[in-house]
Design a protein with these regions (language model features):
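Flexible, solvent-exposed loop/hinge segments and secondary-structure transition points
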Residues: 2-208
Length: 208
């Protein structure tokens, strides 16, 4: 009986401690949630501004977003509409290069309706440190080579790494990584340009 009482008390004590810890954790979460959400929003806004300059839009870019149907905009996972004076001026979209050296490379691309690439940034990757990670702006300015490049029928041959006959540099000892990014930017940009009518229709709800 004595052992039972001790065990019961010990169990109640553990339960009380667990309940207290849960309550404290919940309280901390509620106190910090808004700040965390605000920080994430600011980070996303800053990233978008790296691929679409502020003077391209006067709408709320963060809230002008769609998740496209893949049968219509294949490879475009998330799409932001830049609107200025009720006219679509640019798009920012998330896409994934599936053939990086170490797997998927997630990208954010900014492009105008005329095919000018305003910027490209890497959102996530698992490439080899010291080789493939030169796709990160904090390590190398290679990713800036896409800025202001134009995708039109006459320039398609240029959209490859130099080893494949194009104009984009590859990395010494790491051709696969830059090749994957160049090819995916090209593929996804062509999908966007080939669906101009659909994009204009989608943009109407944000041009009011």
């Amino acid at each position: 009986m004595g052992i039972f009482k001790v065990t019961s008390r010990f169990g109640l004590l553990l339960g009380f401690i667990a309940l207290t810890c849960t309550a404290v954790s919940a309280g901390i979460y509620m106190l910090t949630k808004d700040k965390i959400d605000e920080a994430m929003t600011e980070q996303q806004k800053a990233l978008l501004l790296q691929v679409i300059p502020q003077d391209y839009f006067n709408n709320n870019l963060l809230e002008s977003v769609e998740t496209p149907e893949q049968d219509k905009l294949k490879g475009i996972q998330k799409l932001y509409f830049a609107i200025k004076n009720n006219v679509p001026t640019a798009y920012a979209y998330e896409t994934t290069a599936p053939d990086g050296y170490s797997g998927n490379i997630r990208l954010l691309v900014g492009i105008t309706p005329k095919g000018e690439v305003l910027g490209v940034r890497v959102i996530e990757h698992h490439e080899t440190p010291g080789l493939g990670d030169k796709i990160e702006l904090r390590i190398s300015d290679w990713i800036l080579s896409f800025t202001n490049q134009v995708i039109v029928p006459e320039s398609l041959k240029d959209w490859a790494v130099k080893k494949d006959g194009g104009k984009f540099d590859q990395f010494s000892g790491a051709t696969i990584t830059p090749r994957a990014i160049v090819n995916q930017v090209k593929r996804s940009a062509l999908v966007m340009l080939e669906n101009e009518a659909l994009l204009n229709e989608m943009a109407k709800k944000y041009a009011q």
